[in-house]
Amino acid sequence: MYEQFGIPGLQAYKKTVDYCKSKDLVVIGDIKRGDIGSTSAAYAVGHLGHVQVGSKKYAGFDEDFATVNPYLGSDGVKPFIEVCKEENKGLFILVKTSNPSSGEFQDRIIDGRPLYEWVGEKVAEWGADHMGKEYSYI
């Protein structure tokens, strides 16, 4: 919702994230990003990581978690996983969404199973490699 207001909206979003963090709240950026590798890497750093400019590091929006769309494949998700590992952050990866038309693609049967089940298995694979004490950060 913030993005519809352009730069002032993004500034308000950053202020909202910072305010929530000042209250020790966990911030989930419901950004649903998913793109080719290099663009996903930029999104991942911008939302969850730090960017190096000269000798100084700057945080972007600095959410604790972000939502990611995996439907472009692993090269669109792996940059987020790498940043999460470096920054001790987490992801919620879309598998089956609740919007009315989600079934147009997500419910398609592939080898006897809906696509979202295949996606869920892949997300579980990614998560298995990144377990914390009790759960995966993916």
Model-predicted regions and their roles:
Residues D35-I138:
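Conserved anion-binding
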Residues M1-A59:
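N-terminal active-site wall of soluble small-molecule enzyme domains
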